[in-house]
């Protein structure tokens, strides 16, 4: 590539923006916290397609990763997905996994809600961090990375 690229964004918005790419209307939305506090969805209304970024991953090998250092939230994730699900689309491009459907994104939303509720339930039962970690691994397929990045924050947020 020629010239210098600063890496800085050229479009900045708080909640919603319209841009045109290749003659197509594209809508950008920030609905709230999920994987981070900066998750943005890119909506192509004419194509009924949503690029969901890291707020939605698809496939068993890609469970929820709550990036607390980046402002993520287990508590708010499902609500953020609810807002995105209000858009009129059929096709979803996740950040990880294959292109899929709105129905699969709705299942993922339910999983984020189940995760949030389960962590809260385990805290109420006064389970230890290690006991909660085991549940996250067995019920939600969390790998060591998820435990390292997300578990302490999820416990703190759900208390």
Model region roles, listed by residue range:
Residues 1-18:
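Active-site HxH/HxHxD metal-binding segment of metal-dependent hydrolases
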Residues 3, 66-67, 130-132:
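Alpha-helical interaction segments
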Residues 86-88, 99-159:
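Accessory terminal helices/loops
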Residues 18, 25, 30-114:
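Metallo-beta-lactamase
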């Amino acid at each position: 590539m020629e010239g210098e690229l600063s890496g800085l964004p050229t479009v900045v918005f708080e909640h919603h923006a319209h841009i045109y790419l290749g003659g197509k209307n594209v809508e950008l939305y920030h609905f709230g916290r999920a994987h981070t506090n900066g998750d943005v969805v890119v909506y192509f209304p004419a194509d009924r397609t949503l690029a969901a970024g890291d707020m939605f991953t698809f496939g068993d090998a890609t469970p929820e990763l709550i990036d607390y250092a980046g402002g993520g939230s287990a508590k708010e994730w499902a609500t953020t997905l609810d807002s995105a699900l209000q858009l009129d689309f059929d096709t979803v491009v996740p950040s990880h996994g294959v292109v899929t459907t709105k129905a699969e994104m709705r299942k993922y939303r339910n999983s984020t809600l189940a995760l949030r509720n389960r962590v809260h339930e385990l805290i109420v039962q006064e389970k230890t961090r290690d006991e909660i970690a085991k549940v996250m691994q067995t019920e939600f397929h969390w790998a060591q990375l998820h435990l390292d990045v997300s578990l302490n924050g999820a416990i703190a947020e759900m208390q």
